[in-house]
Amino acid sequence: MERVWNPAAGIDGLKRSETYLVDPHDFVGVLTLSPYTVFERGLFVRMSGMRLLALLAAPKPQEPQPAVRRFPQRSRRNVCLKACADGAQSLAKVLAARVSMPPCMSKTMADLSSAPRGNMYRKRFEFNCYLANVITCTKCKTACLIGALLHFYRMDAKCVGEVTHLLIKAQDVYKPSNCAKMKKVTKLCPQASMCKGLNPICNF
């Protein structure tokens, strides 16, 4: 079965004989599409590992320049999640042990662990934004966080698209909703007045 390619992983682990689903937005100016191009799941193009390697080796166009990932200048918890990306360790268990998450994020993570899809978009968005703001890895440069989330979401195509957009393609780091909105609007705050600050990212 074909796998959704994670652009943050680069050529590491890429196998020529396997088939991958690739987001054409990752190869703007390199991959040529036509009216006859077949899109899998409405988002991806199927290609062999050999062709994907060739695309990665192809000269990149000078314009437009790819978006530069800009992280906010604030302290974050240095946690390597490579073992979670490989499936050797549970992301939920590692985060519970290494990060002091607020109740809203702990509950959201538990809910997503059971079922990442099914009216769960808001929870995925808030959880992804929270981790993007509080977790870093000086060794992997956030690639392990992306891989861990993809494994956590069971490589679901929609979830993969959301993660890659938020953590790779977006120019700015989105913040999760503030605590007031979490409580009154999205109803994701299970225990008010138990955290410091006005946003979940104040707690890690």
Curated annotation (Swiss-Prot):
Q: Any idea which UniProt keywords this protein has?
A: Transcription, Transcription regulation
Q: Provide a GO biological process annotation.
A: viral genome replication
- InterPro entries associated with the record: Lef-2
Q: What does this protein do?
A: Required for late and very late gene expression. Specifically required for expression from the vp39 and polh promoters.
The family classification in the record reads: Belongs to the baculoviridae LEF-2 family.
State what protein this is by name.
Answer: Late expression factor 2
- Designated gene of the protein: LEF-2
